[in-house]
Regions:
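The feature captures the conserved acid-bearing segment of alpha/beta-hydrolase catalytic domains
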Residues: 9-12, 139-222
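Intrinsic disorder
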Residues: 16, 23-26, 78-85, 203-206, ...
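Acidic, Ser/Thr-rich intrinsically disordered and amphipathic helical segments
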Residues: 31, 90, 119, 177-180, ...
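The conserved beta1-alpha1 loop
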Residues: 22-24, 112, 138, 166-167
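Serine-hydrolase catalytic machinery in alpha/beta-hydrolase-like enzymes
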Residues: 2-107
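Basic helix-extension-helix modules of the SAP/HeH family
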Residues: 225-268
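Primarily recognizes the serine-hydrolase "nucleophile elbow" in alpha/beta-hydrolase
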Residues: 99-157
């Protein structure tokens, strides 16, 4: 199934980490794009994929954007395993693209809202190499009975951090379903932090986004800048400007390479 192009928000600073966030049922990636600026992580690139449109059972069979079919939203509801596996493969491909571009798996965090959270969780748990983290906002664990046999050994051995946020007044994905999912992951050995939000419905909140920001800062902190060569005179103008930018040093008053070089040498 052809997937729409994701919304990509480039890092505003030196790119050293990537966050992939999946939307919920009936939504699209652009709806969550403002989260990128709200997180205030200049070193992070954010990718907001959009699901293809398909018939959805819980939507009376009407087509809408969905990562897989949803037959129900209770702990006993059957899952669309084939649809979920296709979505996981897509997320793994997005991760592979980031790795090919030079971002290690340990610097990639996946997460999402509602059904997007469910898919991103499985994507992190089954990825061959340990990711930097995973977050679920109002989500749940799909295929609970089969996940133990699908788990990547590195997910447990590297203690990949998982943040699971859920509102107590969620009437779409019931709070109890979130609790059951979190407990199931914990029993599997997952390094999970379950956070309840009193009074919150099937939505996000400023406090939840603040908690997500703190989680991302902990999982994928800004990488320290590369060391400055002892003799930077052989560097190009672009490289000298890059060194200054990484360290927050203004170079707008540098009109010659010698000016840049003098500023860089002052940092040694």
């Amino acid at each position: 199934m052809a997937m729409p192009s994701p919304v990509v928000v480039p890092a505003s600073g030196k790119h050293s980490a990537t966050v992939i966030m999946l939307h919920g049922l009936g939504d699209q990636g652009s709806s969550w794009a403002p989260v990128a600026s709200q997180m205030g992580l200049s070193h992070c690139k954010f990718i907001f994929p959009s699901a293809a449109t398909r018939p959805v059972s819980i939507n009376m069979g009407a087509p809408c954007p969905a990562w897989a079919d949803i037959k129900g939203l209770s702990p006993d509801s059957p899952d669309d395993e084939e649809g979920a596996k296709q979505a996981i493969e897509y997320v793994h491909k997005l991760i592979a693209d980031e790795v090919a571009a030079g971002i290690p798996p340990s610097r990639v965090v996946v997460g999402g809202f509602s059904q997007g959270a469910a898919i991103s969780c499985l994507s992190a748990m089954t990825h061959k190499e340990a990711l930097g983290g995973c977050f679920l906002l109002s989500g749940w664990l799909m295929m609970r009975q089969k996940v133990p046999s699908m788990l990547s050994p590195s997910f447990l051995s590297d203690k990949v951090p998982v943040l699971h946020c859920h509102g107590t007044n969620d009437m779409i994905v019931p709070f109890l379903f979130g609790q059951v999912s979190s407990q199931a992951m914990e029993q599997m050995g997952a390094n999970i932090d379950f956070k309840p939000y009193p009074g919150m419905a099937h939505e996000s909140s400023p406090q939840e986004l603040s908690d997500l920001q703190a989680f991302l800062k902990k999982c994928i902190p800004e990488a320290p800048p590369a060391p400055i060569p002892s003799d930077p005179s052989g560097l190009s103008v672009k490289e000298l400007k890059g060194i200054l930018k990484e360290r927050g040093v203004d170079s707008s008053d540098c009109f010659e390479k010698s000016d840049l070089l003098a500023k860089v040498k002052s940092l040694l």
